[in-house]
Amino acid sequence: MSFKDLRSFIDHLEANGELKRISYPVDPHLEMTEIADRVLRAKGPALLFENPTNHSMPVLANLFGTPKRVAMALGKEDPLALRDVGELLAFLKEPEPPRGFKDAISKIPMFKQALNMPPKTVRNPACQQVVKTGDEVDLTQLPIQHCWPGDVAPLVTWGLTITKGPRKSRQNLGIYRQQLLGKNKLIMRWLSHRGGALDFADFKEQFPGERYPVVVALGSDPVTILGAVTPVPDAMSEYAFAGLLRGERTEVCKALSCDLEVPASSEIILEGYIDPDEMAEEGPYGDHTGYYNETDKFPVFTVTHITHRKDPIYHSTYTGRPPDEPAMLGVALNEVFVPILRKQYPEIIDFYLPPEGCSYRMAVISIRKQYPGHAKRVMMGAWSFLRQFMYTKFIVVVDDDVNCRDWNDVIWAITTRMDPKRDTVMIDNTPIDYLDFASPVAGLGSKMGLDATNKREGETNREWGTPIVMDPKVKQKIDSIWDELGIDDSPTL
């Protein structure tokens, strides 16, 4: 099932008991965060606050608060089915040459589908039903959440930022938080390696001193939103990828103030520009690490136009110590990464980003080990293959007899198959998340790899331990007589 706009997805969630409407007045200042956090930790539904205090616009929260809802947004019922998305991405990133004529013929539909999914431009889009310019532009009229007591100001969190570099044929879609600075100003917090910042840097180089057009879409359809946070191949637009997932082309329209294309079904569109000479101090804000981050200077986004649907819905979230919505999104997208990594490294059995590791700061990988040093090769590959893992600080590699998603198994492997000196890899001066205050220098720190695999000849001179395993025939016999033993086989045993 596909969803052409946010409202159809809301209806689907409500019909399936995955969305709760809250009519009681709730303040976007702190109160929404506390409610959303409690509900998310209880694995509860998405929330639609129908009467935000001092605002007339409803607020949608916890939309992707469970892996199941992320899967539902992509037309799947089970998060494990998201591996199909990963298979598609793996194919698009590095299509294998056909093994013969029949194989070539079988690949034609996928190539044809990929080529036939450019966005579709529509007229009279829903996102431009209401247009505000000049003095009518007032961002304070939006029910922007003030998430934590130490936050400096309200924060736009789910804004889909649309940019284009002067040397690129396609637009970039990225999600960057934006601090409310005034009635028509936001601070655009994009890190230097992100697509929007790279586009801006290219523009400044080619057109020094000129204003850079930017558009932010709020409340787009769920597939387009998720397309902006998946590892789409560089040559493919997020709009085209969203169309592939949806099975039909993404509908877009031209912005009113520039040539950028925006999702036509979005609830709210913010249009404007960034003056290369206007910067402002951003933060502090409570972040996905569970701490308030340091302040830093980022470009100011001046909003010249606000367009929206009639009776728009404001889509929002909060970030904090896991579990939070980004962590749940990470759990779901974990299944997307597995086929992509396996495509490059077939020896990988499974890959896990523990949500308590702030979505990406720790990874655990199980492999079918084939030679000495194999675990270290996989570590280096994981750090370098996808840019999503350039900030991963810790990688643990285990054998295929260890469940990399079970901490009991992983800790057992670390404590029995590792020598701290021999099996620990330390790399200095690597890219680190700017929000990581534990690194000695902002944006630069070290990485650690833990080889918790069984060691082979060349890695050790000692006789290696053999795991204890019960005789299968004995296990089978005990299974057959278990009910007669009168033992409660509850999980507490």
From Swiss-Prot:
Binding site for Mn(2+): 172, 238
Protein's pathway: Cofactor biosynthesis; ubiquinone biosynthesis
Needed co-factor(s): prenylated FMN; Mn(2+)
Entry annotation: catalytic residues: 287
Subcellular location: Cell membrane
Membrane topology according to the record: Peripheral membrane protein
Top EC group: lyase
EC number: 4.1.1.98
Catalyzed reaction equations: a 4-hydroxy-3-(all-trans-polyprenyl)benzoate + H(+) = a 2-(all-trans-polyprenyl)phenol + CO2
Domain of life of the source: Bacteria
Residue numbers binding prenylated FMN: 175-177, 189-191, 194-195
UniProtKB keywords: Cell membrane, Decarboxylase, Flavoprotein, FMN, Lyase, Manganese, Membrane, Metal-binding, Ubiquinone biosynthesis
Predominant place of localization: membrane
Disulphide bonds in the chain: none
Cleaved signal peptide residues: none
Gene Ontology CC: one annotated term: plasma membrane
Record text on cofactor binding: Binds 1 prenylated FMN per subunit.
GO biological process: ubiquinone biosynthetic process
Protein role: Catalyzes the decarboxylation of 3-octaprenyl-4-hydroxy benzoate to 2-octaprenylphenol, an intermediate step in ubiquinone biosynthesis.
PANTHER family to which the protein is assigned, alphabetical: 3-OCTAPRENYL-4-HYDROXYBENZOATE CARBOXY-LYASE-RELATED, FERULIC ACID DECARBOXYLASE 1
Entry similarity comment: Belongs to the UbiD family.
Assembly, per entry: Homohexamer.
Name the record gives this protein: 3-octaprenyl-4-hydroxybenzoate carboxy-lyase
Annotated source species: Shewanella sp. (strain MR-4)
Top-level taxonomy: Bacteria, Pseudomonadati, Pseudomonadota, Gammaproteobacteria, Alteromonadales
